[in-house]
Structure formats: C-alpha cells, structure tokens
Amino acid sequence: MPAESGKRFKPSKYVPVSAAAIFLVGATTLFFAFTCPGLSLYVSPAVPIYNAIMFLFVLANFSMATFMDPGIFPRAEEDEDKEDDFRAPLYKTVEIKGIQVRMKWCATCRFYRPPRCSHCSVCDNCVEEFDHHCPWVNNCIGRRNYRYFFLFLLSLTAHIMGVFGFGLLYVLYHIEELSGVRTAVTMAVMCVAGLFFIPVAGLTGFHVVLVARGRTTNEQVTGKFRGGVNPFTNGCCNNVSRVLCSSPAPRYLGRPKKEKTIVIRPPFLRPEVSDGQITVKIMDNGIQGELRRTKSKGSLEITESQSADAEPPPPPKPDLSRYTGLRTHLGLATNEDSSLLAKDSPPTPTMYKYRPGYSSSSTSAAMPHSSSAKLSRGDSLKEPTSIAESSRHPSYRSEPSLEPESFRSPTFGKSFHFDPLSSGSRSSSLKSAQGTGFELGQLQSIRSEGTTSTSYKSLANQTRNGSLSYDSLLTPSDSPDFESVQAGPEPDPPLGYTSPFLSARLAQQREAERHPRLVPTGPTHREPSPVRYDNLSRHIVASLQEREKLLRQSPPLPGREEEPGLGDSGIQSTPGSGHAPRTSSSSDDSKRSPLGKTPLGRPAVPRFGKPDGLRGRGVGSPEPGPTAPYLGRSMSYSSQKAQPGVSETEEVALQPLLTPKDEVQLKTTYSKSNGQPKSLGSASPGPGQPPLSSPTRGGVKKVSGVGGTTYEISV
C-alpha cells in the first residue's frame, strides 16, 4: 500500500483487505457486545480483558503489515546504468558461505537483484528478502514487514481460537435459551471464527516452519534450495530470534513528500546581468588604457558563443559627455558627411575595420577609428606634446596595420605603417612644405576631404594583389632626422586649417572668413630623404625608377630655380588663389620631409615662386609657425586648360595602381578642392601679384613602363 500512492487507483486490490478488516472488526465487536457480558458474570471478569488485549494486538500487527514498507529497492535512473542495460549478462554469481548464489538482472529496476530479492509483479518493485504478496493485507511481505505479518498470523489464530472457545462456553451456559438473541449472535460469531480458523491456522503453521528453517515463501515454492543447502539459515533458534527480535531493516525509499510552492521575494533573487560599466585593461605596446563600454547580457552571451574566427562586433559609439567641446562639431560633421561617405566611400576592408585607437593619456578612451580620428584631431591642437613623447619610444610592429595615418589619433603611441605608393591614387597628394620656427611637438595629420575612399581602396587592392608587405610600410619615426629637430618658439595654431569632416558647403563658407592674404616669404631648403625599396615588388620598384628617370629627363620650366637635392623630393606645387587654401597629406611627403636639415634662423628662398606663407604640411612634418597651408588645383583630374599667366607643374599619377572604377570615383570625388569647386582652385592671381612661373603649354605624354603599365605625364 505505501507504494500505491502515486499510481492508478484499482478498487479490486482493496476488496480482500477490506473484507478481512470487516470480518475481523465486525466479529470481534459482536463478541464483545453479546457474549462477553454473560461470560464476565458466569466465568470470570478477565475473559473480556484478555479478548480485548488480543484483539488490539491483532489489529496492530495487521495495520503494520498493511502499511509498512516491505523493503523496496529504489529503481536506478535512466542513464545511471545505461551500458549495463545493453551489455550486462542476465545473471551474476556471488558466493555466500561457500555456496554460489545467482543474482538476476532486473530490466525494470535496471540493477542486479541482491540475493533473496525478487521483483513483485503486483507492486512492480524489487523487494528485499521477498516472501510473497499478500492480498489480505494488500502489500508485499518482505524483510521489513515480515515480522509483523508473522505476528499477525499468530495473534489472529489465537484470537480466533479465543472468540470461538468463549462463544462455545456462553452457548453451553444458555443451552435452554438457544432461541434468544444473545445466544443466536454468539453462535453466528462462532461460525465466522471457525470459518477463518482453518486457513489462518494452516498459514500460520506454514510460516512457523519457514521461520524455523530460515526460508521465505518464495524460496520454498520455487524450490531454490530443495536439493542443496540453504546458505541463509542459522539454526532454528537463531532464525526465530532473527525474525522476532532483530532490529528493523533500514528503509531504502524516502517518504513521499508533497512539493511545496514557495514564493521567493526579490531579496532572494539573483540579479540579472544588467547594462553596466565594465572596465577592461588593455596592454598595447606598453600603453595602458581603460576601455569603458556598456555590455548587456545578450552581448556577453553572443561574445561567448562566437568563435575566434568570427568578426568582432562593432564597437559602441563614443561618449560625447567626455568631449564637451566637440559635441557641436561632431554633430554637424556626422549629419552632413554621412550622405557623402555613403555614396563615395567603399566598404572598409576587414583587416582594419574595427581597430580602436588607444591613447597614451589616461583620460582618452578607445573608440572606433572614425570617431577616434575626429576626437583626437581636436585634442591634438590642445595637447601637441604627446606625440613628441610617444615618438621617442621604440616602435612595436607586433600587429601590422594598413590604416591611413589620417585616421589615427595623434596621441597614439605606435609607429605608423603607410604605403609609399598610395600617393599615386590621389589627385593632390604631393603638397608639402616647411616653415621656419617650427616645434617638434606640434605634429598633425591634415588630409584633404575625399582622399579617404581612394586611400582605402588602393590599400585594399594592393593588399589583395600581394604587391606590398608589412615591413615596407615605412613610418615618419624611422627617419634618422626625426629626432634631430630642435624645439623652437611655440607658433600659433595654423590659420588655414579646415576640418576634413566638414561638408563642402560649410568649408566653402568658412574659407573666406578664416584665411586672409598672406605676405610671401622665402622658401625652405630641403634635402631628399633616401627612398627605401626594400620589400616592394619588382613592378613597383621599376615604376618608381622609371618615374624618377622621366622627371630628370624632362626640361626645367622657365623661371624655375632647381635647387640641388630637390629632384626627387616628390613635392609639386600649383598656383591658386590665396582665399582657397587646401592641404593634403602624402606618404611620399611623410618619408621625404627632412625635419632637421633646414636652418631655423634664416629665411628660405622660395621654390617655384611660391610664397612660404602658403605652404602645406605633410604627415610627418612638424607644424609650421605663422604660415598657413596653401593648395592649388591638380591638373590630373581636371578637364580645363590652365589660364595664361598661370604656371602648371609636372604631376605624375600612378594610374596602374587604380582600376577604372577607382578612376571614376576619383574624378567625381576630387572635382572639389577641400569642399570648393574647381573654379576656385584654378583662379588666376590678383592683378598686383606677378605670375609665379611661366606656364607650360605642352600636351599629355603617355609612357609605357615595365609590366605593361602606362603613365600620363603632363609636359
């Protein structure tokens, strides 16, 4: 019965036990009601007391045999003995007192049954020392409840004998009154007691024999030890004492408990992973920076699930609260340049798509390259000495990068890897000069608007073709002259600086307000830095050598003073109006600018008749003093002829490095000079200003180089 609580209710199982209980309780009640009062008067008052004690003992043992756990073994879990369920043999043999005893595998309970254990087909459980299943108590009789069953049989037999005997005595005393009610009820109780006495007495005798011999009903019926010796017997007295006087066996099943539903209040709930600030320490080339980002529970899960090959998720937007001065500037640049970048810019190569720029200062945070360039460009005006300090550290090349210098933060303390031939894919990239009285600390990367898409695409194409290697990407810090510059008086900020992130319309409106006419000064003496061709491919080296040869062979322009050492400087200049300045960065300028060769105290002689006050700066060159950047119009991407009186210089565009698709984009992108129409860049000088050099009226000469490449040279 204890095992039936969780199973389907079967009324037929309770019929025998209910009948036994009714007969036991009903017959005894009638005996106490009609027979015991007369026996207490005629025989002894002890007769009702004896029968009452015997009845209670019978009822107690009956209840214990019915409701007590017989010794059920718990079933194994589904995956506990999975291998044994398929591969185990049907029997295993153990030795008990020198006798081999078989243990059978139970497929239902999924374990080997211990000795004297059997699976009950009614209860559907394996019971320790299984005796039999008794329907009168509706329970299996096993090791734990066999004692109470045996005592129930003994007490019931004695009780039946007492009821029958005392009822017969009452009838003998009232033999003249057999038709009376008391005598009739007593005779009915005697019939019931006599009817149950024979089977109960027989079953009791059988179990007395089994107990004396140390056997169970199952072993006796199946004949396990019929022809041999019982290894479980300890003699008659020991067997009886073991059944009646031994301590009860342990219970293997826990008592069934109802699951309680408990309402958990918030203090006991584990807090979910909410959006919060997570600080990550980043070690890169000896620079420690704190990266504060907001990560949610979903992003953490995605990061954990991603493999090492997967592309990292895009970094979050920069925290504008830390850069209060640039809020308005960034808002305008983002809103007005988003449409231009979406149309003209190619997709960023995967190689440097998500490269945050780390700052050497503790207050700067790591951000994506576009936003980092915007913020760091503004910070470089206020903190110019951070590059000077970081440039003295050795350059680490543990992680090569193809990102242009103009997209990097000026305070980033790593050496810049740049393509020396990327200038061939730009329209006006060979503009650079140096003024007097410059300072080493103020180094800025000023690029023209529109060079972003071309430099990205040229770098991506060269990387795919395998024509460049990471070691050939030289940096300004590699030059031996970089550290030989002496600090001069601190100059004012550049007057003609226009943010490359401003739209063309805003830049055009602000140009007239920012840049007044400047008085021309003498030029600066320059000496070329050695060009490094270490790890370039053969085609590129041959193209460069042929380009140098063509430049040497071309006749000098009238009115042009050729200084020694300037033949291969890679610097070209075209005239333009003073109110339309433009500066552009070039990889050639970054490697060819001799920072320590110009005397600081004397004025320089002008080159090409170009005022020094209208000079631009390269990537690796220090910031000029009171000069303002100046830029003319390139004639490589313009279809108009130069006006009379205006000189045009030679400019070689390395067109084989670009695909036709790139050229179309370049013509569209570079039709404006820093956000201004081409007409502004090609305007003739004022009437009071003499022409800077005599014009060159030659045509365009096409020269075929090594590898089938074709160059267009303006002669």
Swiss-Prot record:
InterPro entries: Palmitoyltrfase_DHHC
GO MF, one example: palmitoyltransferase activity
Reaction catalysed by this enzyme: L-cysteinyl-[protein] + hexadecanoyl-CoA = S-hexadecanoyl-L-cysteinyl-[protein] + CoA
Membrane-protein topology: Multi-pass membrane protein
Residues bearing PTM Phosphotyrosine: 91, 533
Sequence ranges of Polar residues compositional bias: 442-478, 666-677
Start-end of Low complexity biased regions: 359-373, 422-432
Keyword Transport on entry: yes
Residues on Cytoplasmic side: 1-13, 60-148, 213-715
Stretch list, region Disordered: 289-715
TM regions (residue ranges): 14-34, 39-59, 149-169, 192-212
Reported modifications of this chain: Phosphorylation regulates association with endocytic proteins and its subcellular localization. Phosphorylation by LYN during fatty acid uptake leads to inactivation of the activity. Autopalmitoylated. Palmitoylation of the C-terminal tail regulates stimulation-dependent plasma membrane motility.
Record PROSITE patterns: DHHC
Localization (cell): Cell membrane; Synapse
Modified residues (Phosphoserine): 247, 296, 299, 345, 380, 398, 406, 409, 415, 425, 429, 432, 529, 554, 621, 684, 694
Modified residues (Phosphothreonine): 294, 303, 348, 350, 411, 436, 659
PANTHER family in alphabetical order: ANKYRIN REPEAT AND LEM DOMAIN-CONTAINING PROTEIN 2, PALMITOYLTRANSFERASE ZDHHC5
Domain free text: The DHHC domain is required for palmitoyltransferase activity.
Role summary: Palmitoyltransferase that catalyzes the addition of palmitate onto various protein substrates such as CTNND2, CD36, GSDMD, NLRP3, NOD1, NOD2, STAT3 and S1PR1 thus plays a role in various biological processes including cell adhesion, inflammation, fatty acid uptake, bacterial sensing or cardiac functions. Plays an important role in the regulation of synapse efficacy by mediating palmitoylation of delta-catenin/CTNND2, thereby increasing synaptic delivery and surface stabilization of alpha-amino-3-hydroxy-5-methyl-4-isoxazole propionic acid receptors (AMPARs).
Family the UniProt entry places it in: Belongs to the DHHC palmitoyltransferase family. ERF2/ZDHHC9 subfamily.
UniProt name for this protein: Palmitoyltransferase ZDHHC5
Taxonomic lineage of the native organism: Eukaryota, Metazoa, Chordata, Craniata, Vertebrata
Gene: ZDHHC5
